[in-house]
């Protein structure tokens, strides 16, 4: 078993986790960030961001449907779900790349695995 010392170990690389890691690094702490999947967490990859992108597609559709109320003659819009899905995927990937770049550009040790508290001042990691 390998042991490393950190001032702060963050379990979970979602929005709160990476924000905590960034703040700790800014305070000159030695930081490890443990993430079992992809930095950004559920919010970025399967939750908040993908849902908001699809809601934005629906909002644009609604705006086009209501365009006639403003004197704009627009034909009935049709949502191409494959295009909406591709846009959603591209947005998620762009944000993921940005977060990954930020983590890599700071003095944060990214550990890919599942972390759990293992006693006073100890974290155990099951690596992927």
Which residue ranges define each predicted feature?
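Short alpha-helical segment within the catalytic ATP-binding CA
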Residues: 19
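Beta1/beta-strand and adjacent pyrophosphate-binding region of the FAD-binding site
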Residues: 2-16
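Glycine-rich flavin
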Residues: 3-6, 22-29, 34-128
């Amino acid at each position: 078993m390998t042991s490393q010392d950190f001032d702060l170990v963050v379990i979970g690389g979602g929005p709160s986790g990476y924000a905590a890691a960034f703040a700790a690094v800014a305070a000159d702490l030695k930081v490890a960030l443990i993430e079992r999947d992809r930095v950004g967490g559920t919010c970025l990859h399967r939750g908040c961001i993908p849902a908001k992108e699809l809601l934005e597609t629906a909002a644009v559709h609604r705006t086009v449907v209501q365009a006639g109320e403003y004197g704009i003659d627009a034909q009935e819009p049709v949502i191409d779900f494959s295009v909406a899905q591709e846009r959603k995927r591209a947005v998620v990937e762009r944000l993921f790349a940005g977060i990954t770049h930020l983590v890599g550009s700071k003095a944060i040790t990214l550990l890919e695995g599942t972390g759990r508290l293992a006693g006073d001042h100890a974290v155990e990691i099951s690596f992927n």
